[in-house]
Amino acid sequence: MSESEGLNMEQSRERFANEVDVALAQSARPFAIHNARKVDARGVAEHYWLVSDGSAIIATGNRDDDFAAACASVGLDADADSDSVSSVGSGDSMTGSAGFVTNAAGRMMTPGYVDIHAHGSWGSSFDDGVQGIRMARAGHMMHGTTRQVLSLITNPLDVMCANLQTVRGMMGARPDILGAHLEGPFLALSRKGAHDPECLKDPVPEYVDRLLHAANGCLRQITIAPELPHGIDAICRFAAAGVVPAVGHCDADYATAYRGFDAGAGIMTHMFNAMNGLHHREPGPIPAAVEDPRVTVELINDGFHVQDPMVRLGFGFAPHRIAFVTDAMAATDCPDGHYLLGALDVNVIDGHARLASNGAIAGSTLTLEKAVQRAVLELGFTPTDAVEAATLIPAKAFGFDRANPVTKQPLGLLAPGYAADVLLLNPATWAVEHVWCDAHFLR
């Protein structure tokens, strides 16, 4: 990429980040979409429509008469739609300030994607303060991730506390930010992956309390190796505080992992990665997770972290409990080169991120858009299963699939009462073409 091309890309991305800021700061208006192929966890429906009142989805269906009535109920004219989906966003609707009716022209319509484990994109990390968060969120929003739990890397405890406070401070104005995920510092040294070993700690009560105090309600999940001293106790403490502990970056045997899940851990952090693997005499943490129907199982479907046969195996292990996550770092949707993950140097070659020091995998450059595309077009998953893994299942991990204090309306389905997070996709490539978040049109 030439210097001028790089500058143009940077300017374009900053412009989109600004548009997201402006749109989400405004009151949303009613909108409607029709002539779409709906795909969500409940199945596929042709000639589908939905109407939002500017807050939630209020009506869905496939009868024209019902569509006209639903539009009229929120002051929209069902016959005054755009000539084509490409004209969506013209004029002031680009900033989310106008109500409009969109003819999807046969495109696929899905709920917005929900990523519960990602560290950054577009050259920025969620540890990089307000500016880093807004840029990294814009990168994922561009690819259809309308809601995201912001993963924070292992750092000195004071830094992690400050980063939690930054996330907490942004949540009031940013409905797309669901809260924070701490991947560290309570990880096994032997399974640290791309985490600074100097910053790893045992989860003693003092450290647990410091993190909970700093988070002030914004902490959604924390990854813990349950075999560490005080590990099970820490899981209990976080769960009692309303945080969802996750088992991962661990060397736990089956019994210890089972105890962790029974104590309140509700997630397995990126199954197969940074943990002891399956063995017929030493089963380890994976069977403990897949046997427990309460556990949501994260999986990085990039073909690199987890090979395709193991992705299929994972879906067979835990049907309707696999959540696609990206574990994306700052290099996501960027050229190969040198980047930082926390304080650690990372080299990205052919889209694969590795620590410069020892070659360990250092996150991914995946988007949920690509994870869903791979699932359908390369692995042969049904559209329903692929979309479910990027929408309803991750939402369920935190109770966001029902009314809740964080998102108000539930996430993960295109149905009345659900949040107006909607994507329109190219039906051949599954590429994201248009995005609504919290009833705001963003692209």
Where are these regions (language model features)?
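His/Asp/Glu-enriched, well-ordered alpha-helical/loop segment
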Residues: P287-V297, F315-T326, T332-L425
